[in-house]
Swiss-Prot record:
Protein name: Hemoglobin subunit beta-1
GO cellular component assignments: blood microparticle; haptoglobin-hemoglobin complex; hemoglobin complex
Known function: Involved in oxygen transport from gills to the various peripheral tissues.
Domain of life of the source: Eukaryota
Similarity-based family: Belongs to the globin family.
Signal peptide location: none
PANTHER family: HEMOGLOBIN FAMILY MEMBER, HEMOGLOBIN SUBUNIT EPSILON
Chain residues that bind heme b: 63, 92
InterPro entries: Globin, Globin-like_sf, Globin/Proto, Hemoglobin_b, Hemoglobin_oxygen_transport
């Protein structure tokens, strides 16, 4: 994947402005609520019976934060995203058996949460760059499935 200087700056700026403790839990909670079949991978997280329970679940919040810190690795290594996610791809495919389509669903939920947070700053150009970045991450995480 080729990245322009503008795209690199946009991704760095977006992630530099995000409060991971806020955005991470919101994105994962949204994914679990909007796509309830994704909950099957989080059985050890306890009560996920309804939206209120999911939003208030500390394990969901902690994992959402962990996901954003994982994305931070990609931000800092934009030229080697597939390589830095190789082990994580193996973990999710071989041990956890996560449906690779779920990565795209979570990426879509993250896009919505970031757009809501950024407001008018999340213009079409910014969105295009953000979604390009997430598409590369999703592809890297799904690499072991192919």
């Amino acid at each position: 994947v080729e990245w322009t200087d503008q795209e690199r700056a946009t991704i760095s700026s977006i992630f530099g402005s995000l409060d991971y403790d806020d955005i991470g839990p919101k994105a994962l909670s949204r994914c679990l609520i909007v796509y309830p079949w994704t909950q099957r991978h989080f059985g050890s997280f306890g009560n996920l019976y309804n939206a209120e329970a999911i939003i208030g679940n500390q394990k969901v919040a902690a994992h959402g934060i962990k996901v954003l810190h994982g994305l931070d690795r990609a931000v800092k290594n934009m030229d080697n995203i597939k390589e830095i996610y190789a082990e994580l791809s193996i973990l999710h495919s071989e041990k956890l058996h996560v449906d690779p389509d779920n990565f795209k669903l979570l990426a879509d939920c993250l896009t919505i949460v970031v757009a809501a947070k950024m407001g008018s700053g999340f213009n079409p150009g910014t969105q295009a760059t953000f979604q390009k970045f997430l598409a590369v991450v999703v592809s890297a995480l799904g690499k072991q499935y192919h």
